[in-house]
Amino acid sequence: MKVLYLTVFLLAIVFSISAQDQTYPIFDECLNVQNSENQKNCFESTLLIKLKERLQLSADFNKTSEEVNLIFEVDENGVFNLIFVEANHPEIKDKFKSAFDNLPQVQPSQAYTNATFSQFSMTLKYPLKDISSYDIQSRKDKPQEQQLQLSEKLIEAKAEFKKIEADAKPYDGEMYSSYVSIPLSHEIYNRFDREINLIGTTAHTAQKPFTYQDVKPYYDFKKENKKLAFNKKSWFSRKLLDEHLATVSGKNYWFAVDFGVDLQLGRDTGNDLDTYNNTRIGYIQGGIGKKLTYYGAIFESQGRFADYFNRLARSRNPADGYPAVVPGRGVAKSFGDNGFDYPVTEGYINYRFNDNFNLQVGNYRNFIGDGYRSLFLSDNTSPVPYVKVDAKFWKVKYTNIYMQARNTNFLTEGGAYSTKFIALHHLSWNVNRRLNIGLFEAAIWNNEAERGFDISYLNPLLFYQMVEFSTGTDAGKVMVGLNYKYKWTDNIYSYGQLLIDELSVDDVFGGDKSFKNKFGLQLGLKYFDAFKVKDLDFQLEYNQVRPYTYSHFQQVTNYAHVGQSLAHLWGTNFREAIAIARYRKDRWYGHAKFIYGLRGFEPNADNIPFYGSNLFGTERNIFSETGVEIGQGNKANSTFAELEVGYLVNPAANLKLYMNLIHRDFSVDVQNERNFDNTTTWINFGFRADLFNWYFEY
């Protein structure tokens, strides 16, 4: 590399500073120069001298005539940054970059006595000649106005990242005033159940999940969580006990990221079986503007449970060879010694058009009802793909949910699970300060022969059984229902549901107990602050569903998803009585639960004859058209008792530490491979992100 004897011959130099009322940057050589014009000249000439000293090009460029366009800045610390260089030869570009990198630090520009960055453009031509003989002037072929405009645009571009940083602000619990859904957890909903059901409140409580904004007028999560805060100083303590793992918040956006777990260790003493669950969870919740919110979670799990629960999972094995469906979670493959590996993903995007209309699209859960169970739509299944539209006006809230459910018992020709579609409608009406009445309808049709989503079912009006007949008698099935809630006092309300599956008036009132008399009934009562003990709550509930309800003569057109009932987790053909007590104090909580059930099961695995208990049987094989009673088939009695005590470790992430004790006694008239006498005592210790209800009361 030969040192190029640089002589300066500058045909054009244009400097344009980025803002008015600014001084020029000052080299050490210019410290004693007075007035702005002289400082400008000193800065320009000194810069050119220092560039000349640092530009070392190979001998090949001695005779090169090369125009070079430069844009650079001096930041608020006085450091030169070359933003743009245009030249034909790559070596010239590289040398200019190196030269600017090696320029000394200067005093930055001053704007109103504050250091600020300034930006310049410059055009040079090689070979360069003696700088002292050069008279600085603007290029004639490139007007100064154009260069100034270019510089200002680049200044704006360079400021984009700083603008994002300037818009950022500390996270301040934006989630608690957003339209993010509150996780469907009985422990979480119990915190505000009394407040949202006071006489005179207008919340439509049968349609769940609620959003934080829905609940805020009655229960302020942000305020209540601050009461529980430990206010630790260390990062680890704050993230473990009080805060989300990571949060980002700005002028029109926010999101919170958490890493959760569901770790359980236990023992089924009645069957001499160690149990465990190992779930790792990554989940994000956020909002863009005031109207768009979202949630997404990934669960990666392995587990082994009490013997009765493992057997139930295996009895629901899909048709494609997987060994099990874990109730409440989904299809599982084998893991380790009689364990399961069952990944789950869930999430949604929610858009709030205005105070009257809301749209949500997701793969998640919904619940309709005021009870512990629902005979309309429950949250005991795996997440279901859906589109949900809510309309709220006057004293009414109207919900339309369009779902795509999977039949894991049946495969298409391509080997995929067959699908069916469900159009569900629920109208909630606050009749007065105390009484709420709801109307329900669900239409189900299968996707055989690639029928797809029948747009006839997009009709948002209730009670359109006529659609079924207009598309053919084999089109699908329709269920209708009625629910109510009555607030007796601020501390007591009763509730109920009546479900009618494929209403046939003659058979319902015929008196011969026809198999077409398919209905379900729920009655319940909640008592808050029982016996004047704050946060002590009681609940009593009775449920019954007659045989053949939720099933259909086409097996794929039942009311189920991934082998699980979309309504009551027992499916059909049962009576059930439930008593629940709950108590909470600060971060501590506890509940006790007792459930008694009279149930009927299919004597044979192939559901022939069909007694109406298995949703996947067909009405073509019914045991009898008349004389149908609850408990028919293989009659069973079951009791289920549960005690759980826990501590809310982190309210923001819903992370809890708990101990759970279950005693289950199940006796059946006829022992077989699927149903047999079994007594279980299952003790479990867990550390869990409480993001969904997980039911074990089978």
What is each PLM-predicted segment?
Residues E160-N436, A443, N447, D512-K516, ...:
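Outer-membrane beta-barrel channel domains
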Residues Y342, L435-A443, E448-Y698:
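Exposed, low-structure sequence patches enriched in small/polar residues
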Residues Y5, T64-E66, T116-S118, Y276, ...:
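Residue-level preference for beta-strand/loop junctions
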Residues L4-F15:
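Sec-dependent N-terminal signal peptides
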Residues L103-Q105, F259-L265, N660-R664:
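Generic short beta-strand segments
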Residues F72, F84-A87, M122, Y126-L128, ...:
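A mature extracytoplasmic/lumenal domain signature
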Residues Y5, A19-I155:
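Charge-biased low-complexity segments
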